[in-house]
């Protein structure tokens, strides 16, 4: 089995090292990841300059681009054979609800999905955790199950693992995406030279975190697995918009 691994935290991140080691138990792993932290890059492709591909001392490849660039470059220009699976992560911090629209971790998996490859995004729901071994083993188990018993194509799974402080999650829940409140306002600051600058504010708190959501599962100690798709069509409004335009 050939597995392509990427992330948005960068090729040097501990989460991707743990993930690559765990997935190495299943087959041949190739790591292609950004040269620096590209969190929040979403599905952006670099179109205004060429990309470079280099190899680090640990054997991982890194690209001066986005997570989407990494997967696109690897699949369409680097690898001699298509990977059987793309796995992105382990992200340092959750990617639940609206996070999935901004997440570079989810975007790397989405690019694999768009290229016809079963893909998984994996995140550890903690900003302070330093041990990614449990999340990496969860990723390995999900990938192994998908390998043994494939789901109907196309496949894009978003996996969030609770921080269990060295213990094990209570189990796994198949969930839908929850929803956050709108983000906090930008933070205004000044440079030492007096220039006004802005920092993007924190993500909003969970607004829809009821039973069945990814937020609820993780908050209660369960791994959340959410099947995703890319079709953004608001099917329920097609008739209403048609009537509106015809009036």
Curated annotation (Swiss-Prot):
Catalyzed chemical reaction(s): a ribonucleoside 5'-phosphate + H2O = a ribonucleoside + phosphate
Entry's Gene Ontology molecular function annotations: 3'-nucleotidase activity; 5'-nucleotidase activity; exopolyphosphatase activity; metal ion binding; nucleotide binding
Cofactors required: a divalent metal cation
Residues bound to a divalent metal cation: 8-9, 39, 91
Pfam families linked: SurE (PF01975)
Disulfide bonds: none
An example Gene Ontology CC term for this record: cytoplasm
Record localization: Cytoplasm
EC number: 3.1.3.5
Keyword Membrane: no
Cofactor remark: Binds 1 divalent metal cation per subunit.
Domain of life: Bacteria
Keywords per UniProt: Cytoplasm, Hydrolase, Metal-binding, Nucleotide-binding
Function: Nucleotidase that shows phosphatase activity on nucleoside 5'-monophosphates.
Family of this protein: Belongs to the SurE nucleotidase family.
Record's protein name: 5'-nucleotidase SurE
Naturally occurring in which organism (per UniProt): Azoarcus sp. (strain BH72)
Gene: surE
